[in-house]
From Swiss-Prot:
Name recorded for this polypeptide: Pyruvate dehydrogenase complex subunit homolog DDB_G0271564, mitochondrial
Cellular component aspect of the GO annotation: mitochondrion; pyruvate dehydrogenase complex
Function, as annotated: The pyruvate dehydrogenase complex catalyzes the overall conversion of pyruvate to acetyl-CoA and CO(2). It contains multiple copies of three enzymatic components: pyruvate dehydrogenase (E1), dihydrolipoamide acetyltransferase (E2) and lipoamide dehydrogenase (E3).
Family affiliation: Belongs to the 2-oxoacid dehydrogenase family.
Keyword Electron transport recorded: no
Gene designation per UniProt: pdhX
Intrachain disulfide bonds: none
Any one Pfam family match given in the protein's UniProt record, by short name: E3_binding
PANTHER family for the chain: DIHYDROLIPOAMIDE ACETYL/SUCCINYL-TRANSFERASE-RELATED, DIHYDROLIPOYLLYSINE-RESIDUE ACETYLTRANSFERASE COMPONENT OF PYRUVATE DEHYDROGENASE COMPLEX, MITOCHONDRIAL-RELATED
Presequence extent in this chain: 1-19
GO molecular function, one term: acyltransferase activity
Principal subcellular localisation of the protein: mitochondrion
Compartment(s) of residence: Mitochondrion
InterPro entries assigned: 2-oxoacid_DH_actylTfrase (IPR001078), CAT-like_dom_sf (IPR023213), E2/Pdx1 (IPR045257), E3-bd_dom_sf (IPR036625), PSBD (IPR004167)
Length: 413
């Protein structure tokens, strides 16, 4: 027999009372939709509603009309059950729980268990966690990154650069000279900015146009315990590779020790962020506002390069069998003499095996083709301010950067 849950109030407090459909709801033939409406709107008894159906049966329309007349609203069943459970639970722990009542349907039991769990959880102690406050550097970084992402129209371009020549040059250097791949990257970036001055610009909100920077000052990202710092190598394009390497090491050490002066990390005209040491293939960096561009450097990886051409690079199509392998033609206008017959026999019979072997040895060889090769490459992604960079400027800058990195001998001149 179906049961429904009813909330009642009396002088002793609130409780849960269950009614049989044959008693308070008066009819065993009540439609499910009617029963659902009675429960949803907190109508305690079907007697409150005037039935107009056959054999005095309560119809859905009757309940809807009653709801409209009384201007009723659906009740919060979970709140209803929660308050009922709280007031109905006995004080003694040995008393049976109301959830164990045999008169409850399984659905209502599940709801009561859920609400009881929520109620009990509220009484438990809160989860302990550690709140790590931001330091001043992290606050400044968060403000600048938010400002950059919200106000600067970012766009992205990626180019693949070969590292074979850079790696070969590093290997050929003396052991006491320690120049990293990132030093080559900084030098290549500086020269590319020098060759493409429009890429070394910034946007002026005051003038509403891009302004060229007079110097090439590259910021490079350094991770510290206090946050990400970007020390600046001033006049990078005018410094040789070894000078850039030494200065970047000194600035990185000072950044980790917290000893950088303001002029050593505030400013800059362009930035480089390298995550290759973490195995990151490629990523998009946020522009270091008010700069207009930043290069995101990925890790080096090996790829298989197909041949640049599929035409033969070496052939042996003009092989000759030699004079000994050729049949000698004997011209005569008359009958062959004995001497001529012997000579002809020698050329065609006695040397047959030698001629055959010589022909086999001097057969034309198949043509040789250029073979695929393994190359070391890395992806470099430019994040640019689209107010300063257009496609042509960005393309020329990345092309110059790729050229210098692929031909490092031009960076030490």
């Amino acid at each position: 027999m179906n049961r429904i849950l009813k909330q009642v109030s009396n002088t002793k407090g609130k409780g849960i009372r269950f009614y049989s459909s044959s008693s308070q709801l008066d009819s065993e033939y009540m439609f499910p939709s009617v029963r659902r409406l009675l429960v949803e709107y907190g109508i305690n008894s079907s007697k409150e509603v005037t039935a107009t159906g056959p054999q005095n049966r309560l119809l859905k329309g009757d309940v809807l009309a009653y709801i409209k007349t009384k201007n009723l609203s659906p009740v919060d069943r979970l709140s209803l059950i929660a308050s009922s459970v709280k007031s109905s639970q006995p004080s003694s722990s040995s008393s049976p729980s109301i959830v164990d009542s045999p008169t409850l349907t399984s659905q209502i039991k599940d709801q009561i268990k859920i609400v009881t769990t929520i109620t009990n959880d509220k009484n438990k102690s809160k989860v302990i966690y550690e709140d790590i406050p931001n330091n001043n550097i992290r606050r400044v970084i968060a403000t600048k990154l938010s400002q950059s992402k919200q106000q600067v129209p970012h766009f992205y371009m990626t180019v693949e650069c070969e590292l074979d020549n850079v790696l070969a040059m590093r290997k050929s250097m003396p052991e006491n000279v320690k120049i990293s791949v990132n030093d080559f990257v900084l030098r290549a970036c500086a020269l590319a900015l020098r060759d493409n001055p429009q890429a070394n610009s910034k946007w002026s909100d005051e003038h509403g146009e891009a302004i060229l920077n007079p110097t090439v000052d590259i910021s490079f990202a350094v991770s510290t315990d206090r946050g990400l710092i970007t020390p600046i190598i001033t006049n990078t394009d005018k410094k040789q590779l070894l000078a850039i390497s030494n200065e970047s090491k000194q600035l990185a050490l000072k950044a980790r020790d917290g000893k950088l002066k303001p002029e050593e990390f505030i400013g800059g005209t362009f930035s480089v962020s390298n995550l290759g040491m973490f195995g990151i293939t490629s990523f998009n960096a946020i522009i270091n506002y008010p700069q207009a561009g930043i290069l995101a450097i990925g890790t080096g990886r090996k790829v298989l390069r197909p041949p640049s051409t599929y035409q033969p690079i070496e052939t042996n199509l003009n092989a000759s069998y030699g004079s000994e392998g050729k049949s000698e033609i004997i011209n005569t206008n008359g009958p062959l003499t004995t001497e001529q017959l012997e000579k002809l026999f020698d050329n065609t019979v006695s040397k047959k095996q030698d001629i055959k072997q010589q022909i086999i040895n001097e057969q034309p060889q198949p043509p040789k083709y250029e073979q695929p090769k393994v190359a070391n490459v890395m992806d470099v992604t430019l994040s640019g301010d689209n107010r300063v960079f257009d496609d042509e400027i960005a393309g020329k800058f990345l092309s110059s950067f790729k050229y210098y990195l692929s031909n490092p001998q031009n960076m030490i001149l």
